[in-house]
Swiss-Prot record:
Protein name: Phosphatidylethanolamine N-methyltransferase
Membrane spanning stretches: 56-76, 87-107, 188-208, 213-233, 245-265, 267-287, 363-383, 390-410, 440-460, 464-484, 535-555
HAMAP family associated with the record: PEMT (MF_03217)
Spans within the Cytoplasmic topological domain: 77-86, 209-212, 266, 384-389, 461-463, 556-869
Catalyzed reactions: a 1,2-diacyl-sn-glycero-3-phosphoethanolamine + S-adenosyl-L-methionine = a 1,2-diacyl-sn-glycero-3-phospho-N-methylethanolamine + S-adenosyl-L-homocysteine + H(+)
Membrane topology field: Multi-pass membrane protein
Length: 869
């Protein structure tokens, strides 16, 4: 059996109980007449179970099926093996066309116009009144006699068929025409499907090699596994959907019953049309004949055409497209991005051999396609001269380096929004940064897969005589499977999900819920499973070349690492750490042995976690023995410093270097000046003594001599010294006086002398015009202010006031010439310290240092980044 009406089950569920055991009701499609469907049986039981009544057509169908084997024997004896194979191949093609085209056309017209049902009603085929006696018939009683005889014959034959098939209690005339038409339709379906199946099996049997060596190998073992799996799929599908969906019942009438998903319908979309044909490929493996494989591919492909043009349109008309608000979330986000950003256009995406969303006004699209064209043409024109070893290294390195680059961007973007910040601080928008990422990611995919295609193609071309045709076709099938997976993934998560939009535009997400529609209903991470099967297909196509195996392993590992260690943690952070069980997972866990293994693993995991937690508690128990105030070192440090000062005063009572109010304030927030009091014995004082400001981390190595430059952060102790260094040093000396025993003074370091960098600093008193240290002050902290960022106006006001005090603002624009210590980097640090964002120097120069533009831009960036948090 090769078909089943499956999409009904996938859209709204599947009946899981026999109609004979529950009270199932049905109604006609157009007239809404309700009725209870009769009990029916599957195809094999109807035709071959001797305990069931058989109609004339069923007997003829059974004889036709059995006769195929006698015909095969007779033709084989008379005309030989090759003729017999082609004879049954032609038969199979005929019945396959009768199935997909014949049944397809019948169902198409039945779906759109209820053609079969209306024909039965028009000609009173299931009515008690004969056609030529029906006063209400739409046909005139003067119709020609042949037509009357024909329809009377059809009427009698159809009624006889149903009576001979159904139990005695079945009242033919009590049921609407829809159910009776469906029962007759089933007979022709039985004939076509069984003939399709039997002729294919005979053709395959005639193609099996005679040598036992050719049969007993790994291919045959894999083929048997696929066949057994195919049988389970068919049996489980019929268990779930029953005859109603198996025979396309909803084209005739609609059942009203409780529907649920179950079994094989949790594993794959359209299982009877997808994994339900794996037996074809299992038989092709056993035969090891590429002709059988091509026939199987034709049969499978025609079934997909039937699904696309017959079943899916009917399902969408009858039940809707099956999408809900959650499944459309990413698509709505794409629309919202386009709506709010008029210069945004959908990104170029490579799907298989085609490109979507090409924009003729976007240079990067030409660059991407041009790269593909150049690589392909170069490979074709220079195929004879290309060294495959060098090409392999090129593919490997390109894939690895580009993956590291992509993964780094995603990781840093997840951790700190690094990529978005990079563009925001340079004056670009959040969406613009996302557009650049879209180009980078798509170009990465296009470049790596183009190189893989070129390398695989040259491998096949250079070693074509050793290539197995069956392996080549199977490899192409795997490539097609990966292409289908990519398309289904993009269909389910839209462009926003395909380009990791929740890494870059999480503020556009309104519902924190992962999609479970489409391919994500069956697999949690389809790109990690099916997203690399095409690469493994190249391994088959190249007859298991070692280099292709290495590339396939690289593709698989990089894919796995990206999903496991970057994508999954980010998804948990954005959507919550909710465990989503895929359809495949549900089905596997439904198997008792696997469920027991899962329970054992969970118990072991719980035991390990509990033991680790207990050990952590024990290792931290010693901390409770420490004094309660042990971690508070501030008061202790103050006491130590006072004791050291007391000792220094006793040794040299007139040596002193203290910051004003240092007991009260040890943290000076810019632009607050720092005033320093100094005292020096008269015999040690030199008019050229000077005081420098240093970072503690730079001077801690030597307490007797300063070995780093002050960088201009210094002041004289006397207004009369260092006359050639300008007024700045004179203005910093605010007081100086001398007595018989000592000289004392006061020096103020304002914004013209201070550092504009957060850190721990100290003052050093130097003897004369040298770097010999006489006194060192208590370390203190200098920090940039935190400006008010409540509103952009308040932020601008505070920023303007600060820049004015620092003397770097003129006509509302930043001018660093006013203070050599407050440059562009200091302004960037001030903004970052206040609002948490960083603007690039290039951007601030581009806006001419306009304080209004800079403050509002920084505030906008903060709002954007806050929305991404």
């Amino acid at each position: 059996m090769s078909s089943c009406k499956t999409t009904l089950s996938e859209m709204v569920g599947s009946v899981t109980k026999d109609r004979g055991t529950i009270n199932v009701k049905a109604r006609t499609r157009s007239s809404n007449v309700t009725f209870k469907p009769p009990v029916t049986h599957d195809m094999v039981r109807s035709l071959f179970d001797p305990t069931l009544k058989k109609s004339l057509l069923e007997k003829c169908i059974a004889l036709a099926i059995i006769s195929n084997f006698f015909i095969c024997y007779w033709v084989f004896q008379r005309f030989g093996l090759q003729f017999t194979k082609y004879f049954f191949l032609v038969q199979y093609l005929f019945w396959r066309i009768a199935y997909n085209l014949g049944i397809g056309l019948v169902l198409h017209y039945q779906s759109h116009y209820e053609t079969l049902t209306n024909c039965a009603k028009t000609h009173a085929i299931f009515s008690k009144i004969p056609h030529n006696k029906d006063a209400n018939s739409n046909f005139s009683t003067n119709s020609n006699s042949f037509s009357e005889k024909f329809w009377n014959f059809i009427r009698k034959f159809c009624q006889y068929e149903i009576r001979s098939k159904m139990p005695k209690e079945y009242d033919l005339f009590a049921y609407p025409e829809e159910i009776n038409v469906w029962l007759i339709f089933r007979q022709f379906v039985d004939l076509i499907l069984m003939q399709d199946f039997v002729t294919y099996i005979i053709y395959v049997y005639l193609s099996i090699p005679y040598s036992w060596v050719q049969i007993f190998n790994w291919r045959s073992l894999l083929g048997v596994i696929l066949i057994l799996f195919n049988i389970w799929v068919k049996l489980d599908a019929h268990r779930v959907v029953k005859d109603y969906a198996w025979y396309w019942g909803d084209f005739f009438f609609l059942e009203e019953s409780e529907l649920v998903f179950d079994g094989v319908f949790n594993i794959s979309p359209h299982p009877m049309y997808s994994i339900g044909y794996l037996g074809y490929y299992g038989l092709s493996l056993i035969c090891n004949d590429y002709k059988v494989l091509l026939v199987s591919v034709f049969g499978h492909y025609s079934q997909f055409l039937f699904l696309k043009y017959v079943e899916n349109p009917h399902i969408e008309r009858t039940y809707g497209d099956g999408t809900d608000s959650d499944s459309q979330m990413n698509s709505r986000i794409d629309d919202l991005i386009s709506k709010e950003n008029y210069d945004y256009s959908r990104p170029l995406i490579n799907m298989g051999l085609s490109f979507n969303n090409f924009n003729k006004l976007r240079f990067t699209d030409y660059f991407t396609i041009g790269t593909v064209a150049a690589l392909m043409l170069g490979a074709i024109m220079n195929a004879r001269f290309i060294n495959l070893n060098y090409l392999f290294i090129t593919v490997f390195v390109t894939k690895l380096v580009s993956w590291l680059f992509i993964s780094t961007i995603l990781y840093k973007q997840s951790q700190s929004k690094w990529f978005t910040r990079l563009f925001l601080e340079n004056g670009y928008t959040q969406v613009y940064s996302y557009e650049q990422w879209q180009f980078i990611y798509n170009y990465y995919l296009v470049l790596t897969y183009t190189l893989m295609i070129i390398y695989t193609g040259l491998q096949i071309w250079s070693n074509f005589s050793n290539i197995n045709n069956s392996q080549l076709i199977f490899g192409l099938i795997l490539v097609a499977l990966q292409t289908w997976c990519d398309k289904e993934t993009r269909l389910a998560i839209s462009d926003f999900g395909w380009f990791y939009g929740d890494f870059f535009l999480s503020n556009y997400i309104s519902t924190r819920k992962l999609t479970s529609q489409g391919i994500y209903r069956y697999l949690n991470h389809p790109e990690a499973v099916l997203g690399v099967v095409g690469v493994w297909g190249t391994v088959l196509m190249t007859n298991f070349a070692v280099t292709n195996i290495i590339l396939a392993v690289l593709w698989t590992l990089t894919n796995f690492i990206l999903v496991k260690f970057i994508e999954t943690p980010h998804v948990n952070k954005i959507y919550g750490k909710t465990k989503r069980v895929s359809g495949v997972g549900k089905t596997l866990l439904g198997l008792k042995p696997l469920r027991q293994v899962s329970d054992i693993v969970n118990r072991i995991e719980n035991i390990i976690i509990k033991s680790l937690v207990d050990e952590s508690k024990n290792s931290n128990g010693g901390a409770e023995l420490l004094p309660k105030n042990y971690q508070d070192n501030k008061e202790w440090n103050i006491l130590i410093q006072e004791a050291m000062d007391s000792v220094a005063t006793r040794l040299s009572p007139y040596c002193e270097l203290k910051i004003e109010n240092e007991q009260i304030e040890t943290n000076f927030v810019l632009p607050t000046p720092v005033t320093l009091n100094w005292k020096m014995p008269i015999e040690l004082y030199n008019g050229d003594d000077w005081i420098g400001l240093y970072k503690v981390i730079d001077t801690r190595a030597d307490r007797e001599k300063t070995r780093v430059g002050s960088g201009g952060h210094w002041s004289a102790t006397s207004k009369d010294s260092y006359m050639n260094h300008g007024l700045r040093h004179k203005e910093s000396v605010t007081e100086i006086k001398a007595t018989e025993k000592y000289v004392q003074g006061k020096v103020t370091f304002d914004t013209s002398l201070l550092y504009f960098e957060n850190g721990i600093y100290e003052f050093r008193y130097h003897s004369g015009n040298s770097h010999k240290v006489l006194l060192i002050s208590t370390p203190f902290e200098i920090s940039l202010p935190v400006l008010n960022t409540t509103t952009p106006e308040l932020f601008e006001k505070d920023l303007t006031e600060f820049l004015t005090k620092v003397n770097v603002l003129k006509d509302g624009k930043f001018r660093p010439l006013g203070n050599k210590f407050f440059g562009m980097d200091s302004l960037k640090q001030l903004i970052k310290n206040s609002i948490g964002v960083e603007l690039s120097s290039e951007y601030m120069r581009r806006v001419n240092g306009d304080a209004h533009v800079i403050s509002h831009r920084a505030w906008d960036i903060k709002q954007t980044l806050d929305s991404l948090a």
